[in-house]
Amino acid sequence: MKVSQNGLNLIKEFEGCRLTAYKPVPWEQMYTIGWGHYGVTAGTTWTQAQADSQLEIDINNKYAPMVDAYVKGKANQNEFDALVSLAYNCGNVFVADGWAPFSHAYCASMIPKYRNAGGQVLQGLVRRRQAELNLFNKPVSSNSNQNNQTGGMIKMYLIIGLDNSGKAKHWYVSDGVSVRHVRTIRMLENYQNKWAKLNLPVDTMFIAEIEAEFGRKIDMASGEVK
């Protein structure tokens, strides 16, 4: 079974794409490029089309077979796509963590558990797991145009960005997928007051954590998201 466009879109929503080779951590031997493709050399550059094509190849050659081996033909397309996204992010948890045989109820109970990194719960992982669960639970016969990742509702929230000393430095607004710098007090008032009926929650994160969760670089001085 192959991942659908909905599955690819879900993965792209939570994975950053970089068209120049980089090392996420300095001790890795090879470089990473595109949508997290590992194994290229320093100085490699790709086009967006190359990155998109390689993502599909990587998923269907490596991660989709993991899910196929687990579900044994019992999953529908949305269930399959959600589990592929989980595998792409967390690896072959079905084998590594000894998952019980596939059933909808069992998998729905397991997906939200993968929200920790470094011994801490990360809100970015919480949001990704919820997006996967929403898709997993969505009937394949649905013709709704609602957003698959949010059940049709864009869930906005504000983020207080802290510098390395823990001091509030900048404000951001996010829908759980992308992040935007709140540049002026007027913009902040718009989010807090004029949109008060949305009852936006407020999260507090170090700016380095924001960069890690959304795969973006932030200028510490200006707060701009690059």
UniProtKB/Swiss-Prot annotation:
A Pfam family annotated for this UniProt entry: Phage_lysozyme
Other observations noted: The bacteriophage lysin is a powerful lytic agent with a narrow target specifically for dairy lactic streptococci.
GO BP term (any one): defense response to bacterium
PANTHER family: LYSOZYME RRRD-RELATED, PTHR38107
Catalytic reaction list: Hydrolysis of (1->4)-beta-linkages between N-acetylmuramic acid and N-acetyl-D-glucosamine residues in a peptidoglycan and between N-acetyl-D-glucosamine residues in chitodextrins
Coiled coil: none
A molecular function (GO) term: lysozyme activity
Family, as annotated: Belongs to the glycosyl hydrolase 24 family.
Protein name: Endolysin
Bridged cysteine pairs (disulfide): none
Keyword line: Antimicrobial, Bacteriolytic enzyme, Cytolysis, Glycosidase, Host cell lysis by virus, Host cytoplasm, Hydrolase, Viral release from host cell
EC number: 3.2.1.17
InterPro entries registered for this protein in UniProt: Bacteriophage_GH24, Endolysin_autolysin, Endolysin_T4_type, Glyco_hydro_24, Lysozyme-like_dom_sf, Lysozyme_dom_sf
Species of the source: Lactococcus phage c2
Top-level taxonomic group: Viruses
Residues annotated as catalytic: E15 (proton donor/acceptor)
One GO CC annotation: host cell cytoplasm
Compartments (UniProt record): Host cytoplasm
Function: Endolysin with lysozyme activity that degrades host peptidoglycans and participates with the holin and spanin proteins in the sequential events which lead to the programmed host cell lysis releasing the mature viral particles. Once the holin has permeabilized the host cell membrane, the endolysin can reach the periplasm and break down the peptidoglycan layer.
